[in-house]
From Swiss-Prot:
Binding site residues for ATP: 14-22, 37
Single GO cellular component term: cortical microtubule
Gene: NEK5
Name of this chain's protein: Serine/threonine-protein kinase Nek5
Compositionally biased spans, kind Basic and acidic residues: 337-356, 362-384, 423-432, 474-484
EC number(s) given by UniProt: 2.7.11.1
Residue ranges of every copy of the Protein kinase domain listed in the record: 8-262
Functional summary from the UniProt entry: May be involved in plant development processes.
Sequence ranges of Polar residues compositional bias: 402-422
Keywords (A to Z) from UniProt: ATP-binding, Kinase, Nucleotide-binding, Serine/threonine-protein kinase, Transferase
Amino acid sequence: MDSRMDQYEVMEQIGRGAFGAAILVNHKTEKKKYVLKKIRLARQTERCRKSAHQEMALIARLQHPYIVEFKEAWVEKGCYVCIVTGYCEGGDMAELMKKANGTYFPEEKLLKWFAQLALAVDYLHSNFVLHRDLKCSNIFLTKDQDIRLGDFGLAKTLKADDLTSSVVGTPNYMCPELLADIPYGFKSDIWSLGCCMYEMAAHRPAFKAFDMAGLISKINRSSIGPLPPCYSPSMKSLIKSMLRKSPEHRPTASEILKSPYLQPYVNQYRPFADISHPIHSLEKPITSSRSSQKSMSGSQCSSISGSDIDSIQSSERNTSGPSTSSNNTIDTEGAEATDHVSVKNCSRSDDVKSNKETVGPELERQDSSKSIHVDQRPRNEIKQPKIIKKILTTLREESKLRQNNSPIRASRVKLNSPSNREQLSDDSKHSSDISSSSKSSEVTSRESAKVICEPVKRAQASPPLKHLSPIVEHSPKAKIKQDEPLQPDPAKQAMEDVDAAVGKVKNRTPPSYSRRLSIPPRRPLGAESPLHADTKRAHNKVIKERAKSPCRPVHGPDNDIIEPPGFPMAPPSPLGGVQMKVGNARAKSAPPRAVSIKEDSSDCSSSTIAYAENTELSEPSKQDSSAQLVSSCKCSIPDAAIQKHDLTAMPSSELNTTNFQKSMASNDDVCENLALEPSSDISEQVSIFKDNVPCSKISQSTANAIVQNDEDKFTVQELLSSVADIAPFVSTKNFALEKGSPPIQSLERTSSPHLNPPIEDVIHVIRHSSFRVCGEQAVAENAEMGVQSSDVGKLLNVVREEVDSRSIPSNNLVPHRLPDCAAPKPNISETNTISSKTACSDVVKFLTVPEVNSTTTAINNGFKEEASPTKEILDVKSFRQRAEALEGLLELSADLLQHNRLEELAVVLKPFGKDKVSPRETAIWLAKSFKGMMNDEASRSSM
């Protein structure tokens, strides 16, 4: 028997997607071009096969002047589904907009397209077909610039007023109710149509953001930019009416056609559409298609959910079950099906590429087990918005998907984005086990059983993504669903949020370094941390202590309450406070307002140092109001290292630089006392270098560090070398600490004669137990204790991001070693009893971990410093700074390549790409941080 393919002459491949290839063919007898969509069933999952059959059946039933023409469909050799559709010479709308190169379309042309699209959508909805993937790249054009709506791979047949809950489509075109995981109906197509019309008018997407959180926020607020002024207010209001947040407030397709403004164009093009083509039964078109489907294996036709069967039977009594399946889930299981990219009927080179939008991939999550009506839902099935995690997970997995597929891409990706592979295999097995005549209750019970069994493997979630959960207005039916408990399953939500957060971090930070800088999610109360067992007990102790006094302020050594007014109290977190014991001192917890994000460091090595990347500095509204600088550092230290020096610190102790109260001097000047605390063998020093800040007069009673009143951003640089080698990487001036009395040497600065010498804002926060200031005895003790260790001087430099180290080379001062003025001492009492009349006459403020203890005669040393030139503010729009950052990244990449450090090179280059989000700040941060690490390692290897 001759194959139907013999009737066609293959010309070229014009697209490739998840199912297979889109091939331009020429009918040998008709001498007419068509598009052949060839789907290889053997490489697809059951759901993909069903979706292919569904598209073949659905498009065969649709016949409308403004919908892509259907020619024929058949199954080739039992393993290929072939769908032949009309060829659109004009390409698609997305390509046409690119060719326009910023030139807006005339309003008449837009209204013509609008009328044709509205007629096509009204035809679909009147026949209970929900397209679910309306976007500009699925709107094709003939050579006469007429509309042809295509790509029905995600279309679904609904009852008259029914809703569906499967999350499908392209994120930029998704409606608020779909993102909120609320059942949606035909109004979701109206929203997508509004997005298309906005994009066709403005030549930019209606909703666009750098990340999924921003996109969801804009969609939930229906926040769109202004349309070009060249269009009439009537057209603008019509487009905006389709983008209303509440589905009830959006017009239907028939109401759009009745709009007085659009009426002339509707009347002009309706005669062609008025030939009222009803949906044909599947018995009429392509009888060979019917016969070939009968020969297909039972597994290919057995995965129709009961709810879809009910929907099909109620709307079309004369059609067969397998052919009318409306279950559209696309599965990503298997290497062959990893890149589910929809094939357009008419695709161009621009469309074959990945979507340029940062949130271009499309996601699909099937809730076939969920019945639409509330009374059919089991009580133990908890429904919650999960689309955010799905989208973020898919964005993270997109890079993996590219590696297993052809370099040619279509413009969207449909992913099931499962939480684990086991669930995927279970879904496939269940879908093949359910016969086409099974009831929806059976499917629902199976799915709910999985929901119950699954969460026990998950950990408690983190809250960073909870603010992303959209809150939308919805229809009465949706409101009934919302009345049900929406509390997320804590164990299930945990892994989703953690995975999403970690996925975002992977694009920005180098996971291959043992010393890594990352922003992990903050765990809520009660979350288990992967630390020692005794650390967990200590955590529990602190948690109980906080539960008793959740809002207890930090007390200084003189019982002064350090509690900046006007700051809201955040909920306490087990990682939010200081959990360190020094001597026999009681471990005090920091106030719950310490909200810096921290990382759970594993107990693998003392070199695993994590620091909060975003150290927040809250800016006061008034000059005399107090603010706080919250920064946190946490390091995992082996027990042996702690016991070696008789330090009674916890095995994985945390350091939280507690709230420094900010106050202002009389003449709007700011000064800052110096906080010093030397460390022993394994010492991490956190140095916050700030620009010089003039001060007019320092009050003798000032007991708190005063921080510069600026919107400061900090970037972490981790330097693992001796302190004397830090100079090239310090972008602001540092105090030199030398031997003798006074231990802190003065630095001269030329200043106005009427001003007192200003003090450089330097805060040294050094880890571990208590210390004692003494003169020569301290030097002798340090000579005995661990100075010879190569690990001394491990330094975390928290440097101003705004300051470019290359622009101030003259001010890089070499910080000397610290053992001259301090030595470790296990007795904590000495740190709290330093007299201002001591022989050293030194002014050193000590920071015992939960407390801030300082003396009041810091001005007696007469600090002076040199004048520094005007600092350079970080400007992401500065081409010079961006060029320097790029140059630094290129040098780093070349160096890594030269040393064959390919894994680290991959980490450096991972955040960049035409389909990746790489803010300019990230590029500059990477250029500085990684280059600093490389230079530091080179200096250590040369020693």
